Swiss-Prot record:
Enzyme superclass (EC): translocase
Record-stated family: Belongs to the ABC transporter superfamily. Energy-coupling factor EcfA family.
Gene coding for it: ecfA1
Gene Ontology cellular-component terms listed: ATP-binding cassette (ABC) transporter complex
Native organism: Staphylococcus aureus (strain MSSA476)
Cellular compartment(s): Cell membrane
Record's protein name: Energy-coupling factor transporter ATP-binding protein EcfA1
Amino acid sequence: MEDKNSVIVFKNVSFQYQSDASFTLKDVSFSIPKGQWTSIVGHNGSGKSTIAKLMIGIEKVKSGEIFYNNQTITDDNFEKLRKDIGIVFQNPDNQFVGSIVKYDVAFGLENHAVPHDEMHRRVGEALKQVDMLERADYEPNALSGGQKQRVAIASVLALNPSVIILDEATSMLDPDARQNLLDLVRKVKSEHNITIISITHDLSEAMEADHVIVMNKGTVYKEGTAIEIFDHAEELTTIGLDLPFPIKINQMLGYQTSFLTYEGLVDQL
């Protein structure tokens, strides 16, 4: 398969957790554009988190194919390809493995047998990028949820990935911490040309994305830019998704534009 503009491609992928269970994913096909931010959204049970598990190899497809940089992912090449993909999970406490911040960032580098001098350099650079260098010697219980997620992103950045997956990474944060983390992710994407994949039920997060895939009942319901997706805002509510606040207000006021950020809403008012 030749698709130079996509980093990950799902082709007719189906998956079930048990052989006698219903399919969680049903003949799913989509492409993740290189260097862009793709948001995969859906309600609980839509199949979006299963997609993340397949991307990082926690689960394997039952039928269909997954391509990474035009290579079919197989048992033989998976470990090599997997090193290019980092993931940040929902609960920051569950992914903190070091006794202090800098040891947590170093953990993945140790597993990859990175030399000590290079490890020290990478840890410092990664923490600096996420504005956590001054807290390098802090214990995890001294950090807020948002700061822990910054450390998780630093741990991923230290490994020089091409792709970062955010699996509901903002869902346990307060609104300010959530927005700060999303701003950081956009900065990281821009500075390093990293592909971002956010798995979320929150359509507000999808407004940050370049490309949006909406999942429903194990299938791709809609796909397009954020503007294209929110042009069908009412349809999104019928599959259990909650519209972002500015779009709700926009509808109440009877404005024509479906897609609207907080800044745009303020300007419009």
